[in-house]
Structure formats: structure tokens, C-alpha cells
């Protein structure tokens, strides 16, 4: 399970350190792809296989299902951690998520998310307008 928030930098070659707390669960190779809200999603290979199976059930007769699958899978790439715990983020994904230098990596249960730090801070501040409790209350019945 992934949790926490970590600030890192993208170097001039498009490499970024993955937080050490995430590396063990991600293993040496994992998948990154376009995520929602202009961030990147990162999945273990096992989790990716499960997502792929779920996506196969989407009706291809629905235009939005086709669009979503195209965007999601065309952006997917398998990355490998180097000896320093870094991954190389391809240019097309850096552009999609507006990653320049300052980045934030967060854990969200079954995935990691890679954000441009300013975009993450804006998202976080914007969503604090609705309190954490209000958001929880609006969700389907869920007990901690």
C-alpha cells in the first residue's frame, strides 16, 4: 500500500528519485501513465494487470470508453529504477503533467501519483475549501 507525500526534483535528463518507502513495493520495474487531474499514475506490474483486465470490460461501442482507453494505454510505459532509485519519465508524460523541476510524489493506496509541485499545491488548496469531513460525508457509506 502506498501512502505519504514526498517532494523531489526532476533533473535535466527527465529523471526523478522515487521515494525509498515506495521502491520496495514497486519493485525494480513498474508502469507509469497519464492520470486524472493532470498527474501521472504509477502502478506495480501486478496492479497494472488487474487494471488491464477491468478495462477490457469497458464497452467498445461507447465513444468515451474508447477515448479513455486510448489516452490511458497510449501514455503507459514500463520504467525501471536505476541504482540511485530514479526513473526516467518520458517527455510526452512530463509534458502532460507539466513536470518541469519541482515535483511531489504521493501514495494513494494501490498507486503512486507524480505531480508538478505547484499543480499539486493548487489542487490541495482548492479542495480544502470543502472540508475533509464534508468530502467523506458525501461519499458512499464507508466506515473507518
UniProtKB/Swiss-Prot annotation:
Alphabetized UniProt keyword annotations: Cytoplasm, DNA-binding, Repeat, Transcription, Transcription regulation
UniProt cross-references to InterPro entries, sorted A to Z: MraZ (IPR003444), MraZ_C (IPR035644), MraZ_dom (IPR020603), MraZ_N (IPR035642), MraZ_sf (IPR038619), SpoVT-AbrB_dom (IPR007159), SpoVT-AbrB_sf (IPR037914)
Domain SpoVT-AbrB as annotated: residue spans: 5-47, 76-119
Localization per record: Cytoplasm, Nucleoid
Pfam families reported for this sequence: MraZ
Main localisation: cytoplasm
Biological processes per GO annotation: negative regulation of DNA-templated transcription initiation
GO molecular function, one term: DNA-binding transcription factor activity
One Gene Ontology term, aspect cellular component: nucleoid
Keyword Transcription regulation attributed: yes
Annotated NCBIfam families: division/cell wall cluster transcriptional repressor MraZ
Protein family: Belongs to the MraZ family.
Binding partners and assembly: Forms oligomers.
Protein name per its UniProtKB record: Transcriptional regulator MraZ
Organism: Staphylococcus aureus
Gene name in the database record: mraZ
Amino acid at each position: 500500500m502506498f501512502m505519504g507525500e514526498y517532494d523531489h526534483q526532476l533533473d535535466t535528463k527527465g529523471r526523478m528519485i522515487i521515494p525509498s518507502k515506495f521502491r520496495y513495493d514497486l519493485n525494480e520495474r513498474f508502469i507509469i501513465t497519464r492520470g486524472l487531474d493532470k498527474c501521472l499514475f504509477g502502478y506495480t506490474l501486478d496492479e497494472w494487470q488487474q487494471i488491464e483486465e477491468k478495462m477490457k470490460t469497458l464497452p467498445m461501442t461507447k465513444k468515451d470508453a474508447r477515448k479513455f482507453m486510448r489516452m490511458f494505454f497510449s501514455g503507459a510505459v514500463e520504467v525501471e529504477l536505476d541504482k540511485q532509485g530514479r526513473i526516467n519519465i518520458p517527455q510526452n508524460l512530463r509534458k502532460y503533467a507539466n513536470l518541469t523541476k519541482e515535483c511531489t510524489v504521493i501514495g494513494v493506496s494501490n498507486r503512486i501519483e507524480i505531480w508538478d509541485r505547484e499543480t499539486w499545491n493548487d489542487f490541495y488548496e482548492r479542495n480544502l475549501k470543502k472540508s475533509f469531513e464534508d468530502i467523506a460525508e458525501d461519499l458512499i457509506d464507508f466506515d473507518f
